[in-house]
C-alpha cells in the first residue's frame, strides 16, 4: 500500500530531527569546526547526498539547532501564540522550563557545550538574530515593563542569566540537586520575577 503525503512528511520530519540530534551531539563533543558533514551522515546512518537534501551546509544545520532551541523556549512562554505573555503563562513557563531541564539534561548539556565554542559564538554574533527573535524580545520587554517600567531590561537580563546559570549547574552535575531543592528554587524564582515577592 503506497504511503500518504502525510506519512512521507512524517518520515521526512523524523529524518530531519535525527540529523539535528546527531549534529548537536557531535558538535558538542567533537567541536563544531572539527565535525564534518560526512561524520554526521555516518552517525545518522545515511548518505551525504541524502543529508544534503535536508541541509545545504553545516552552518545551516547549526542555525537549525539554534532555531529549534529558541522555538521550544518560546512555545513554553507563549503557548497560545498571541504575542502576549500573561501572568499565568509566565508562571507556567517556570514549570515547563524546569521540567525540560530535568528530563532533557543530555540535550541541554550538549547545547551549552555547543554555544560556548568560540567559533559558534562568532557565528551567532554575525547574524543569527532574526525578526522572530526581536519579536520574542519585545514580548519580554512588554511583560516586565508593566511591573517595573524603569528596570524592564535589567529584569530580563537578570532572569536570563539566572535561568542559564542554574540550568548549566544542573545539567553538568544533577546529582548535587535534590528534587525538593529544585522545586523550592523554582517557586522562589516565580515569587521574585512574577509574583513580586522574595519569599
Predicted segments with their positions:
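Short hydrophobic clusters on alpha-helical segments that form packing/core surfaces
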Residues: 15, 19-27, 97, 163
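Amphipathic alpha-helical segments used for helix-helix packing
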Residues: 89, 100-127, 171-175
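Amphipathic alpha-helical packing segments from all-alpha helical-bundle domains
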Residues: 79, 103, 120-147, 153-157, ...
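Hydrophobic alpha-helical connector segments
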Residues: 64, 78-105, 146, 156-159, ...
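C-terminal peripheral helix-coil segments that are non-catalytic and often amphipathic
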Residues: 1-2, 99, 134-150, 172-199
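Short, basic, alpha-helical segments at the C-terminal edge of helix-turn-helix-like DNA-binding modules
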Residues: 67-73
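N-terminal intrinsically disordered/low-complexity leader segments
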Residues: 1-14, 199
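Helix-turn-helix
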Residues: 18, 26-60, 64
Amino acid at each position: 500500500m503506497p504511503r500518504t503525503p502525510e506519512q512521507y512528511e512524517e518520515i521526512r520530519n523524523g529524518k530531519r530531527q535525527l540529523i539535528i540530534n546527531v549534529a548537536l551531539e557531535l558538535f558538542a563533543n567533537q567541536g563544531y569546526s572539527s565535525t564534518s558533514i560526512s561524520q554526521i551522515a555516518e552517525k545518522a546512518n545515511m548518505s551525504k547526498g541524502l543529508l544534503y537534501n535536508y541541509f545545504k551546509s553545516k552552518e545551516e544545520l547549526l542555525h537549525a539547532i539554534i532555531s529549534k532551541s529558541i522555538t521550544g523556549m518560546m512555545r513554553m512562554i507563549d503557548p497560545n501564540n498571541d504575542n502576549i505573555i500573561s501572568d499565568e503563562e509566565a508562571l507556567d513557563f517556570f514549570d515547563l522550563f524546569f521540567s525540560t531541564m530535568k528530563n532533557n539534561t543530555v540535550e541541554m548539556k550538549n547545547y551549552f557545550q555547543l554555544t560556548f565554542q568560540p567559533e559558534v559564538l562568532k557565528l551567532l554574533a554575525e547574524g543569527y538574530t532574526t525578526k522572530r527573535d526581536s519579536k520574542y524580545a519585545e514580548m519580554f520587554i512588554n511583560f516586565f515593563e508593566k511591573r517595573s517600567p524603569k528596570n524592564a531590561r535589567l529584569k530580563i537580563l537578570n532572569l536570563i542569566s539566572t535561568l542559564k546559570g542554574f540550568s548549566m549547574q544542573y545539567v553538568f552535575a544533577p546529582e548535587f540537586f535534590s528534587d525538593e531543592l529544585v522545586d523550592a528554587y523554582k517557586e522562589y524564582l516565580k515569587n521574585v520575577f512574577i509574583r513580586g515577592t522574595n519569599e
